[in-house]
Protein backbone atom coordinates (compact mmCIF):
# COMPACT_ATOMS: atom_id res chain seq x y z
CA UNK A 1 0.00 0.00 0.00
CA UNK A 2 2.94 2.31 0.74
CA UNK A 3 4.29 1.68 -2.75
CA UNK A 4 0.90 2.54 -4.21
CA UNK A 5 0.85 5.82 -2.30
CA UNK A 6 4.38 6.60 -3.49
CA UNK A 7 3.47 6.03 -7.13
CA UNK A 8 0.37 8.19 -6.72
CA UNK A 9 2.37 10.99 -5.09
CA UNK A 10 4.94 10.98 -7.90
CA UNK A 11 2.29 11.44 -10.57
CA UNK A 12 0.41 14.18 -8.71
CA UNK A 13 3.62 16.04 -7.70
CA UNK A 14 4.60 16.35 -11.35
CA UNK A 15 1.06 17.51 -12.05
CA UNK A 16 1.32 20.13 -9.27
CA UNK A 17 4.57 21.54 -10.66
CA UNK A 18 3.05 21.67 -14.11
CA UNK A 19 0.03 23.48 -12.66
CA UNK A 20 2.27 26.27 -11.34
CA UNK A 21 4.04 26.50 -14.70
CA UNK A 22 0.66 26.72 -16.47
CA UNK A 23 -0.52 29.58 -14.25
CA UNK A 24 2.71 31.50 -14.89
CA UNK A 25 2.46 30.91 -18.65
CA UNK A 26 -1.18 32.04 -18.82
CA UNK A 27 -0.44 35.22 -16.85
CA UNK A 28 2.47 36.18 -19.14
CA UNK A 29 0.54 35.21 -22.28
CA UNK A 30 -2.59 37.22 -21.49
CA UNK A 31 -0.65 40.24 -20.24
CA UNK A 32 1.38 40.19 -23.45
CA UNK A 33 -1.66 40.65 -25.68
CA UNK A 34 -4.07 42.73 -23.60
CA UNK A 35 -4.48 46.41 -24.38
CA UNK A 36 -2.53 48.68 -22.06
CA UNK A 37 -5.07 51.48 -22.48
CA UNK A 38 -8.21 49.36 -22.03
CA UNK A 39 -6.93 46.87 -19.47
CA UNK A 40 -9.66 45.56 -17.16
CA UNK A 41 -8.92 43.45 -14.08
CA UNK A 42 -12.00 41.22 -14.36
CA UNK A 43 -11.49 40.38 -18.04
CA UNK A 44 -7.78 39.73 -17.46
CA UNK A 45 -8.41 37.39 -14.52
CA UNK A 46 -11.21 35.62 -16.44
CA UNK A 47 -8.99 35.07 -19.48
CA UNK A 48 -6.08 33.77 -17.38
CA UNK A 49 -8.31 31.49 -15.30
CA UNK A 50 -10.24 29.97 -18.22
CA UNK A 51 -7.11 29.28 -20.27
CA UNK A 52 -5.35 27.82 -17.22
CA UNK A 53 -8.25 25.45 -16.47
CA UNK A 54 -8.16 24.12 -20.05
CA UNK A 55 -4.39 23.56 -19.91
CA UNK A 56 -4.64 21.89 -16.49
CA UNK A 57 -7.30 19.54 -17.87
CA UNK A 58 -4.95 18.59 -20.70
CA UNK A 59 -2.18 18.06 -18.16
CA UNK A 60 -4.32 15.34 -16.55
CA UNK A 61 -3.94 13.20 -19.69
CA UNK A 62 -0.34 12.07 -19.07
CA UNK A 63 -1.10 11.64 -15.34
CA UNK A 64 -4.00 9.37 -16.24
CA UNK A 65 -1.85 7.32 -18.61
CA UNK A 66 1.02 7.21 -16.10
CA UNK A 67 -1.17 5.87 -13.30
CA UNK A 68 -2.80 3.06 -15.30
CA UNK A 69 0.61 2.06 -16.70
CA UNK A 70 2.32 1.97 -13.31
CA UNK A 71 -0.24 -0.49 -11.96
CA UNK A 72 1.45 -3.22 -14.01
CA UNK A 73 4.94 -4.57 -14.52
CA UNK A 74 6.47 -4.80 -17.97
CA UNK A 75 6.08 -8.60 -17.86
CA UNK A 76 2.29 -8.17 -17.87
CA UNK A 77 1.57 -8.87 -14.20
CA UNK A 78 0.00 -6.45 -11.74
CA UNK A 79 2.27 -4.97 -9.10
CA UNK A 80 1.91 -6.33 -5.57
CA UNK A 81 0.11 -3.25 -4.27
CA UNK A 82 -2.29 -3.01 -7.24
CA UNK A 83 -5.23 -5.00 -5.89
CA UNK A 84 -8.80 -4.33 -7.00
CA UNK A 85 -9.55 -1.71 -4.32
CA UNK A 86 -6.39 0.31 -4.96
CA UNK A 87 -6.95 0.20 -8.72
CA UNK A 88 -10.50 1.50 -8.37
CA UNK A 89 -9.34 4.19 -5.94
CA UNK A 90 -6.70 5.46 -8.37
CA UNK A 91 -9.15 5.44 -11.28
CA UNK A 92 -11.73 7.33 -9.22
CA UNK A 93 -9.15 9.94 -8.20
CA UNK A 94 -8.47 10.80 -11.83
CA UNK A 95 -12.18 10.59 -12.70
CA UNK A 96 -13.12 13.04 -9.93
CA UNK A 97 -10.36 15.34 -11.18
CA UNK A 98 -11.94 15.31 -14.63
CA UNK A 99 -15.41 15.83 -13.13
CA UNK A 100 -14.18 18.92 -11.29
CA UNK A 101 -12.20 20.48 -14.13
CA UNK A 102 -14.82 19.79 -16.80
CA UNK A 103 -17.52 21.26 -14.55
CA UNK A 104 -15.40 24.41 -14.14
CA UNK A 105 -14.96 24.56 -17.93
CA UNK A 106 -18.73 24.38 -18.42
CA UNK A 107 -19.15 27.18 -15.86
CA UNK A 108 -16.59 29.34 -17.69
CA UNK A 109 -17.93 28.70 -21.20
CA UNK A 110 -21.65 28.95 -20.49
CA UNK A 111 -21.77 31.54 -17.72
CA UNK A 112 -18.70 33.44 -16.59
CA UNK A 113 -17.04 34.32 -19.92
CA UNK A 114 -20.35 35.34 -21.62
CA UNK A 115 -21.32 37.40 -18.56
CA UNK A 116 -18.00 39.30 -18.48
CA UNK A 117 -18.11 39.77 -22.27
CA UNK A 118 -21.64 41.24 -22.31
CA UNK A 119 -20.84 43.33 -19.24
CA UNK A 120 -18.02 45.11 -21.07
CA UNK A 121 -20.14 45.42 -24.20
CA UNK A 122 -22.70 47.32 -22.12
CA UNK A 123 -19.92 49.30 -20.43
CA UNK A 124 -19.19 50.93 -23.78
CA UNK A 125 -22.57 52.65 -23.47
CA UNK A 126 -21.83 55.92 -21.66
CA UNK A 127 -25.33 56.40 -20.27
CA UNK A 128 -25.66 52.88 -18.78
CA UNK A 129 -25.39 52.49 -15.00
CA UNK A 130 -23.51 49.60 -13.40
CA UNK A 131 -26.79 47.98 -12.28
CA UNK A 132 -28.14 48.19 -15.83
CA UNK A 133 -24.94 46.67 -17.21
CA UNK A 134 -25.19 43.70 -14.84
CA UNK A 135 -28.88 43.12 -15.59
CA UNK A 136 -28.37 43.25 -19.35
CA UNK A 137 -25.32 40.96 -19.15
CA UNK A 138 -27.28 38.44 -17.05
CA UNK A 139 -30.15 38.55 -19.54
CA UNK A 140 -27.90 37.64 -22.46
CA UNK A 141 -25.97 35.09 -20.38
CA UNK A 142 -29.21 33.29 -19.55
CA UNK A 143 -29.34 32.04 -23.13
CA UNK A 144 -25.98 30.29 -22.69
CA UNK A 145 -27.14 28.75 -19.40
CA UNK A 146 -30.22 27.34 -21.16
CA UNK A 147 -28.00 25.82 -23.87
CA UNK A 148 -25.80 24.20 -21.19
CA UNK A 149 -28.86 22.78 -19.41
CA UNK A 150 -30.18 21.34 -22.68
CA UNK A 151 -26.82 19.70 -23.43
CA UNK A 152 -26.74 18.12 -19.96
CA UNK A 153 -30.30 16.82 -20.33
CA UNK A 154 -29.69 15.42 -23.79
CA UNK A 155 -26.46 13.80 -22.62
CA UNK A 156 -28.18 12.18 -19.65
CA UNK A 157 -30.96 10.57 -21.68
CA UNK A 158 -29.60 10.09 -25.20
CA UNK A 159 -29.56 6.36 -26.07
CA UNK A 160 -26.11 4.80 -26.19
CA UNK A 161 -27.15 1.50 -27.78
CA UNK A 162 -25.13 0.67 -30.86
CA UNK A 163 -26.75 -0.66 -34.03
CA UNK A 164 -26.84 -4.43 -34.23
CA UNK A 165 -24.57 -6.23 -36.64
CA UNK A 166 -24.52 -9.87 -35.70
CA UNK A 167 -22.36 -10.93 -38.63
CA UNK A 168 -19.21 -9.21 -37.39
CA UNK A 169 -17.08 -10.19 -34.42
CA UNK A 170 -15.89 -6.58 -34.24
CA UNK A 171 -19.34 -5.53 -33.04
CA UNK A 172 -19.03 -7.75 -29.99
CA UNK A 173 -15.77 -6.05 -29.10
CA UNK A 174 -17.36 -2.61 -29.52
CA UNK A 175 -20.32 -3.50 -27.32
CA UNK A 176 -18.12 -4.91 -24.57
CA UNK A 177 -15.90 -1.83 -24.73
CA UNK A 178 -18.80 0.60 -24.39
CA UNK A 179 -20.24 -1.43 -21.52
CA UNK A 180 -16.87 -1.12 -19.80
CA UNK A 181 -17.01 2.68 -20.15
CA UNK A 182 -19.78 2.90 -17.57
CA UNK A 183 -23.41 3.92 -17.72
CA UNK A 184 -23.67 6.65 -15.07
CA UNK A 185 -26.11 9.38 -16.05
CA UNK A 186 -23.92 12.11 -14.56
CA UNK A 187 -20.91 10.91 -16.53
CA UNK A 188 -22.99 10.72 -19.71
CA UNK A 189 -24.40 14.23 -19.26
CA UNK A 190 -20.99 15.77 -18.58
CA UNK A 191 -19.33 13.79 -21.36
CA UNK A 192 -21.98 14.90 -23.89
CA UNK A 193 -21.56 18.56 -22.95
CA UNK A 194 -17.76 18.43 -23.08
CA UNK A 195 -17.86 16.49 -26.36
CA UNK A 196 -20.10 19.21 -27.82
CA UNK A 197 -17.52 21.84 -26.83
CA UNK A 198 -14.73 19.63 -28.19
CA UNK A 199 -16.60 19.47 -31.49
CA UNK A 200 -16.59 23.28 -31.63
CA UNK A 201 -12.91 23.16 -30.67
CA UNK A 202 -12.33 20.84 -33.62
CA UNK A 203 -13.80 23.47 -35.97
CA UNK A 204 -11.57 26.13 -34.38
CA UNK A 205 -8.54 23.84 -34.74
CA UNK A 206 -9.35 23.24 -38.41
CA UNK A 207 -9.68 26.99 -38.97
CA UNK A 208 -6.78 28.35 -36.91
CA UNK A 209 -4.40 25.56 -35.83
CA UNK A 210 -4.13 23.88 -39.23
CA UNK A 211 -3.31 27.21 -40.89
CA UNK A 212 -1.03 28.31 -38.05
CA UNK A 213 1.02 25.10 -38.33
CA UNK A 214 2.14 26.25 -41.79
CA UNK A 215 2.06 30.04 -41.29
CA UNK A 216 4.17 30.16 -38.10
CA UNK A 217 7.28 28.30 -39.37
CA UNK A 218 7.23 29.91 -42.82
CA UNK A 219 6.91 33.40 -41.31
CA UNK A 220 9.92 32.64 -39.09
CA UNK A 221 11.91 31.44 -42.09
CA UNK A 222 10.93 34.33 -44.42
CA UNK A 223 11.17 37.06 -41.77
CA UNK A 224 9.92 40.61 -42.35
CA UNK A 225 10.73 43.23 -44.96
CA UNK A 226 13.70 45.54 -44.50
CA UNK A 227 12.83 48.61 -42.42
CA UNK A 228 15.14 50.83 -44.48
CA UNK A 229 13.55 49.66 -47.74
CA UNK A 230 10.05 50.23 -46.33
CA UNK A 231 11.02 53.77 -45.24
CA UNK A 232 12.32 54.50 -48.73
CA UNK A 233 9.06 53.27 -50.30
CA UNK A 234 7.02 55.23 -47.77
CA UNK A 235 8.98 58.43 -48.47
CA UNK A 236 8.36 58.06 -52.20
CA UNK A 237 4.64 57.56 -51.52
CA UNK A 238 4.56 60.70 -49.35
CA UNK A 239 6.20 62.78 -52.08
CA UNK A 240 3.78 61.41 -54.68
CA UNK A 241 0.70 62.17 -52.53
CA UNK A 242 1.97 65.68 -51.64
CA UNK A 243 2.51 66.41 -55.33
CA UNK A 244 -1.01 65.19 -56.11
CA UNK A 245 -2.46 67.42 -53.35
CA UNK A 246 -0.61 70.45 -54.77
CA UNK A 247 -1.98 69.68 -58.23
CA UNK A 248 -5.56 69.60 -56.94
CA UNK A 249 -5.15 72.80 -54.88
CA UNK A 250 -3.64 74.63 -57.85
CA UNK A 251 -7.03 74.41 -59.53
CA UNK A 252 -8.47 76.89 -56.99
CA UNK A 253 -5.68 79.51 -57.03
CA UNK A 254 -7.86 82.01 -58.88
CA UNK A 255 -10.51 81.80 -56.13
CA UNK A 256 -12.84 79.43 -57.89
CA UNK A 257 -14.27 76.66 -55.64
CA UNK A 258 -13.18 73.11 -56.30
CA UNK A 259 -15.69 70.75 -57.93
CA UNK A 260 -17.21 68.07 -55.68
CA UNK A 261 -15.12 65.38 -57.35
CA UNK A 262 -11.87 67.24 -56.63
CA UNK A 263 -12.92 67.95 -53.04
CA UNK A 264 -13.47 64.23 -52.46
CA UNK A 265 -10.13 63.41 -54.06
CA UNK A 266 -8.40 66.07 -51.92
CA UNK A 267 -9.93 64.67 -48.75
CA UNK A 268 -8.83 61.15 -49.65
CA UNK A 269 -5.30 62.34 -50.40
CA UNK A 270 -5.07 64.18 -47.07
CA UNK A 271 -6.21 61.05 -45.22
CA UNK A 272 -3.66 59.02 -47.14
CA UNK A 273 -0.94 61.54 -46.31
CA UNK A 274 -1.73 61.38 -42.57
CA UNK A 275 -1.51 57.59 -42.68
CA UNK A 276 1.81 57.66 -44.54
CA UNK A 277 3.31 60.16 -42.08
CA UNK A 278 2.12 58.00 -39.20
CA UNK A 279 3.83 55.02 -40.85
CA UNK A 280 6.97 57.10 -41.28
CA UNK A 281 7.12 57.86 -37.54
CA UNK A 282 6.67 54.19 -36.64
CA UNK A 283 9.20 53.01 -39.20
CA UNK A 284 11.74 55.55 -37.96
CA UNK A 285 11.17 54.45 -34.36
CA UNK A 286 11.55 50.75 -35.22
CA UNK A 287 14.66 51.33 -37.36
CA UNK A 288 16.41 53.09 -34.46
CA UNK A 289 15.13 50.66 -31.80
CA UNK A 290 17.62 48.44 -29.97
CA UNK A 291 15.02 45.66 -30.08
CA UNK A 292 15.14 45.67 -33.89
CA UNK A 293 18.92 45.33 -33.82
CA UNK A 294 18.64 42.52 -31.26
CA UNK A 295 16.06 40.67 -33.39
CA UNK A 296 18.30 41.10 -36.43
CA UNK A 297 21.11 39.35 -34.56
CA UNK A 298 18.72 36.48 -33.76
CA UNK A 299 17.70 36.05 -37.40
CA UNK A 300 19.66 32.77 -37.89
CA UNK A 301 18.05 31.36 -34.74
CA UNK A 302 14.58 32.22 -36.07
CA UNK A 303 15.34 30.39 -39.31
CA UNK A 304 16.43 27.32 -37.33
CA UNK A 305 13.24 27.48 -35.25
CA UNK A 306 11.18 27.83 -38.42
CA UNK A 307 12.78 24.74 -39.96
CA UNK A 308 12.24 22.84 -36.70
CA UNK A 309 8.57 23.85 -36.53
CA UNK A 310 7.87 22.86 -40.12
CA UNK A 311 9.50 19.46 -39.50
CA UNK A 312 7.34 19.00 -36.39
CA UNK A 313 4.26 19.99 -38.40
CA UNK A 314 5.12 17.42 -41.07
CA UNK A 315 5.63 14.79 -38.34
CA UNK A 316 2.16 15.52 -36.94
CA UNK A 317 0.55 15.53 -40.38
CA UNK A 318 2.16 12.22 -41.39
CA UNK A 319 1.21 10.61 -38.06
CA UNK A 320 -2.36 11.90 -38.31
CA UNK A 321 -2.68 10.73 -41.91
CA UNK A 322 -1.43 7.21 -41.10
CA UNK A 323 -3.70 6.99 -38.05
CA UNK A 324 -6.76 8.09 -40.03
CA UNK A 325 -5.86 5.76 -42.88
CA UNK A 326 -5.59 2.92 -40.37
CA UNK A 327 -9.10 3.73 -39.12
CA UNK A 328 -10.45 3.92 -42.66
CA UNK A 329 -9.06 0.48 -43.49
CA UNK A 330 -9.33 -1.45 -40.22
CA UNK A 331 -11.88 0.23 -37.91
CA UNK A 332 -15.27 -1.19 -36.89
CA UNK A 333 -17.05 1.39 -39.08
CA UNK A 334 -18.81 4.73 -38.80
CA UNK A 335 -21.55 3.43 -36.48
CA UNK A 336 -18.90 2.64 -33.85
CA UNK A 337 -17.17 5.99 -34.17
CA UNK A 338 -14.33 4.39 -36.19
CA UNK A 339 -13.01 2.60 -33.11
CA UNK A 340 -9.91 0.64 -34.02
CA UNK A 341 -8.62 -2.48 -32.27
CA UNK A 342 -4.86 -2.63 -32.30
CA UNK A 343 -2.52 -0.76 -34.63
CA UNK A 344 -2.11 -2.03 -38.17
CA UNK A 345 -0.33 1.03 -39.62
CA UNK A 346 2.24 2.36 -37.17
CA UNK A 347 3.01 6.07 -37.10
CA UNK A 348 6.07 7.77 -35.56
CA UNK A 349 4.33 9.26 -32.51
CA UNK A 350 2.42 6.08 -31.72
CA UNK A 351 5.74 4.24 -31.57
CA UNK A 352 7.63 6.99 -29.73
CA UNK A 353 5.27 7.73 -26.82
CA UNK A 354 5.15 4.19 -25.33
CA UNK A 355 8.95 4.05 -25.50
CA UNK A 356 9.32 7.39 -23.71
CA UNK A 357 6.85 6.33 -21.02
CA UNK A 358 9.31 3.74 -19.73
CA UNK A 359 11.48 6.66 -18.54
CA UNK A 360 9.07 8.91 -16.63
CA UNK A 361 8.45 11.81 -17.24
CA UNK A 362 9.75 11.89 -20.84
CA UNK A 363 6.31 11.17 -22.28
CA UNK A 364 4.88 13.85 -19.98
CA UNK A 365 7.36 16.35 -21.42
CA UNK A 366 6.55 15.35 -25.01
CA UNK A 367 2.79 15.71 -24.50
CA UNK A 368 3.37 19.10 -22.86
CA UNK A 369 5.43 20.15 -25.89
CA UNK A 370 2.67 18.93 -28.24
CA UNK A 371 0.00 20.91 -26.36
CA UNK A 372 2.14 24.06 -26.26
CA UNK A 373 2.92 23.62 -29.95
CA UNK A 374 -0.82 23.54 -30.69
CA UNK A 375 -1.28 26.68 -28.54
CA UNK A 376 1.44 28.65 -30.36
CA UNK A 377 0.34 27.54 -33.84
CA UNK A 378 -3.29 28.31 -32.97
CA UNK A 379 -2.26 31.77 -31.78
CA UNK A 380 -0.32 32.30 -35.02
CA UNK A 381 -3.43 31.32 -36.99
CA UNK A 382 -5.67 33.64 -34.97
CA UNK A 383 -3.25 36.56 -35.37
CA UNK A 384 -3.07 36.03 -39.14
CA UNK A 385 -6.79 35.45 -39.71
CA UNK A 386 -8.44 37.40 -36.89
CA UNK A 387 -11.74 36.57 -35.17
CA UNK A 388 -14.61 36.40 -37.65
CA UNK A 389 -18.34 35.76 -37.55
CA UNK A 390 -19.02 34.35 -41.01
CA UNK A 391 -17.86 37.20 -43.34
CA UNK A 392 -17.77 39.89 -40.62
CA UNK A 393 -14.45 40.53 -38.91
CA UNK A 394 -15.16 41.04 -35.21
CA UNK A 395 -11.72 41.56 -33.66
CA UNK A 396 -8.04 41.75 -34.46
CA UNK A 397 -5.47 40.25 -32.12
CA UNK A 398 -2.54 42.63 -31.65
CA UNK A 399 0.30 42.41 -29.20
CA UNK A 400 -0.37 44.95 -26.44
CA UNK A 401 -3.53 46.24 -28.17
CA UNK A 402 -6.19 43.55 -27.75
CA UNK A 403 -9.46 44.85 -26.31
CA UNK A 404 -11.02 43.09 -23.26
CA UNK A 405 -13.83 41.59 -25.37
CA UNK A 406 -11.36 40.31 -27.97
CA UNK A 407 -9.19 38.89 -25.20
CA UNK A 408 -12.16 36.90 -23.88
CA UNK A 409 -12.93 35.65 -27.39
CA UNK A 410 -9.28 34.69 -27.83
CA UNK A 411 -9.14 32.67 -24.61
CA UNK A 412 -12.50 31.05 -25.37
CA UNK A 413 -11.19 29.85 -28.74
CA UNK A 414 -7.92 28.64 -27.20
CA UNK A 415 -9.87 26.87 -24.44
CA UNK A 416 -11.93 24.97 -27.02
CA UNK A 417 -8.83 24.13 -29.08
CA UNK A 418 -7.03 22.82 -25.98
CA UNK A 419 -10.06 20.62 -25.24
CA UNK A 420 -9.72 19.19 -28.73
CA UNK A 421 -5.99 18.48 -28.29
CA UNK A 422 -6.83 15.46 -26.11
CA UNK A 423 -8.57 13.84 -29.06
CA UNK A 424 -5.80 14.97 -31.41
CA UNK A 425 -3.26 13.18 -29.22
CA UNK A 426 -5.52 10.12 -29.22
CA UNK A 427 -5.65 10.30 -33.03
CA UNK A 428 -1.86 10.44 -33.17
CA UNK A 429 -1.31 7.64 -30.61
CA UNK A 430 -4.56 5.71 -29.99
CA UNK A 431 -3.09 2.71 -28.15
CA UNK A 432 -0.97 4.94 -25.91
CA UNK A 433 -3.92 7.12 -24.85
CA UNK A 434 -6.15 4.09 -24.30
CA UNK A 435 -3.83 1.77 -22.35
CA UNK A 436 -0.48 3.49 -21.90
CA UNK A 437 2.37 0.97 -21.73
CA UNK A 438 0.32 -1.83 -20.13
CA UNK A 439 1.01 -5.44 -21.10
CA UNK A 440 -0.96 -8.58 -20.36
CA UNK A 441 -0.05 -12.28 -20.41
CA UNK A 442 -1.13 -14.65 -23.17
CA UNK A 443 -0.50 -18.36 -23.51
CA UNK A 444 1.93 -19.26 -26.26
CA UNK A 445 2.78 -22.78 -27.44
CA UNK A 446 6.47 -23.51 -28.00
CA UNK A 447 8.23 -26.61 -29.24
CA UNK A 448 10.91 -28.04 -26.92
CA UNK A 449 13.53 -30.46 -28.29
CA UNK A 450 14.48 -31.56 -24.76
CA UNK A 451 11.00 -32.80 -23.94
CA UNK A 452 10.17 -33.74 -27.58
CA UNK A 453 6.81 -32.04 -27.42
CA UNK A 454 4.94 -28.79 -27.07
CA UNK A 455 4.84 -26.67 -23.91
CA UNK A 456 2.85 -23.59 -22.93
CA UNK A 457 4.54 -20.36 -21.93
CA UNK A 458 2.96 -17.09 -20.74
CA UNK A 459 4.40 -14.16 -22.73
CA UNK A 460 3.59 -10.45 -22.37
CA UNK A 461 1.64 -8.63 -25.07
CA UNK A 462 0.73 -4.96 -25.43
CA UNK A 463 -2.80 -4.24 -24.16
CA UNK A 464 -5.50 -3.83 -26.78
CA UNK A 465 -9.22 -4.48 -27.17
CA UNK A 466 -8.60 -8.25 -27.36
CA UNK A 467 -7.23 -8.31 -23.81
CA UNK A 468 -9.37 -9.77 -20.99
CA UNK A 469 -11.36 -7.11 -19.16
CA UNK A 470 -9.60 -7.70 -15.84
CA UNK A 471 -6.09 -7.57 -17.33
CA UNK A 472 -5.99 -4.06 -18.83
CA UNK A 473 -7.31 -0.78 -17.43
CA UNK A 474 -8.72 1.81 -19.83
CA UNK A 475 -7.76 5.43 -19.08
CA UNK A 476 -10.46 7.77 -17.81
CA UNK A 477 -9.59 10.13 -20.67
CA UNK A 478 -10.75 7.52 -23.14
CA UNK A 479 -14.10 7.31 -21.34
CA UNK A 480 -14.81 10.98 -21.94
CA UNK A 481 -13.55 10.85 -25.52
CA UNK A 482 -15.62 7.84 -26.61
CA UNK A 483 -18.76 7.85 -24.53
CA UNK A 484 -20.77 8.79 -27.64
CA UNK A 485 -19.80 7.10 -30.90
CA UNK A 486 -21.25 9.83 -33.15
CA UNK A 487 -18.83 12.42 -31.74
CA UNK A 488 -15.93 10.08 -32.53
CA UNK A 489 -17.21 9.76 -36.09
CA UNK A 490 -17.33 13.57 -36.40
CA UNK A 491 -13.76 13.84 -35.05
CA UNK A 492 -12.60 11.30 -37.63
CA UNK A 493 -13.91 13.36 -40.55
CA UNK A 494 -12.62 16.50 -38.83
CA UNK A 495 -9.10 15.05 -38.93
CA UNK A 496 -9.32 14.72 -42.72
CA UNK A 497 -10.53 18.33 -42.95
CA UNK A 498 -7.60 19.35 -40.71
CA UNK A 499 -5.13 17.75 -43.13
CA UNK A 500 -6.73 19.45 -46.15
CA UNK A 501 -6.69 22.90 -44.50
CA UNK A 502 -3.03 22.40 -43.49
CA UNK A 503 -2.07 21.70 -47.11
CA UNK A 504 -4.05 24.72 -48.33
CA UNK A 505 -2.44 26.90 -45.65
CA UNK A 506 1.00 25.62 -46.62
CA UNK A 507 0.44 26.61 -50.25
CA UNK A 508 -0.95 30.04 -49.28
CA UNK A 509 1.92 30.71 -46.85
CA UNK A 510 4.50 29.77 -49.48
CA UNK A 511 2.91 32.11 -52.05
CA UNK A 512 2.59 35.10 -49.70
CA UNK A 513 5.45 37.59 -49.55
CA UNK A 514 7.28 38.88 -46.51
CA UNK A 515 5.29 40.78 -43.90
CA UNK A 516 5.78 44.45 -43.13
CA UNK A 517 7.54 45.23 -39.84
CA UNK A 518 4.47 47.30 -38.90
CA UNK A 519 1.80 45.02 -40.34
CA UNK A 520 -1.64 46.17 -39.21
CA UNK A 521 -0.68 49.80 -38.60
CA UNK A 522 -2.92 50.96 -41.45
CA UNK A 523 -5.85 48.96 -40.11
CA UNK A 524 -5.63 50.06 -36.47
CA UNK A 525 -7.91 53.05 -36.15
CA UNK A 526 -6.99 53.35 -32.49
CA UNK A 527 -3.27 53.61 -33.17
CA UNK A 528 -1.94 56.73 -31.51
CA UNK A 529 1.18 58.55 -32.53
CA UNK A 530 2.78 58.32 -29.11
CA UNK A 531 2.66 54.52 -28.88
CA UNK A 532 4.93 53.10 -31.56
CA UNK A 533 6.60 50.67 -29.18
CA UNK A 534 3.79 48.14 -29.49
CA UNK A 535 4.91 47.35 -33.02
CA UNK A 536 8.58 47.23 -32.22
CA UNK A 537 8.18 44.23 -29.93
From Swiss-Prot:
Record keyword Transmembrane helix present: yes
Cellular location(s): Endoplasmic reticulum membrane; Lysosome membrane; Cell membrane; Cytoplasmic vesicle, Clathrin-coated vesicle
One term under GO cellular component: plasma membrane
In-chain residues carrying the UniProt-annotated modification Phosphothreonine: 235
TM segment ranges: 8-28, 48-68, 98-118, 142-162, 186-206, 303-323, 362-382, 406-426, 484-504
Domain of life: Eukaryota
Residues with attached carbohydrate: 75, 85, 166-167, 344, 445, 454
Known partners and oligomeric status: Interacts with ABCD4; this interaction induces the translocation of ABCD4 from the endoplasmic reticulum to the lysosome. Interacts with ABCD4 and MMACHC; this interaction ensures the transport of cobalamin from the lysosome to the cytoplasm. Interacts with INSR, adapter protein complex 2 and clathrin heavy chain.
Name this protein carries in UniProt: Lysosomal cobalamin transport escort protein LMBD1
Amino acid sequence: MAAAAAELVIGWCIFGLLLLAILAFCWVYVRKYQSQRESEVVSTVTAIFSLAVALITSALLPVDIFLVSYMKNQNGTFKDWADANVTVQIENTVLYGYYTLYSVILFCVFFWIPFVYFYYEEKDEDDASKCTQIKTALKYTLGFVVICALLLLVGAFVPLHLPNNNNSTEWEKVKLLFEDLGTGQGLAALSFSISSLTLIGMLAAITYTAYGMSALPLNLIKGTRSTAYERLENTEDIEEVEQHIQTIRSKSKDGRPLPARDRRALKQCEERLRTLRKRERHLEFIENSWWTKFCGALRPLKIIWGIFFILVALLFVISLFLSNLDKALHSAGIDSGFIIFGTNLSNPLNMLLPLLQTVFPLDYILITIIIMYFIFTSMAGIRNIGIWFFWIRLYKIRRGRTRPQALLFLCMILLLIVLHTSYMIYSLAPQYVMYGSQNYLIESNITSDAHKGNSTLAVPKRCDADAPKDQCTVTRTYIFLHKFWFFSAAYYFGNWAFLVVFLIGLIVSCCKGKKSVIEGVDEDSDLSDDEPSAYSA
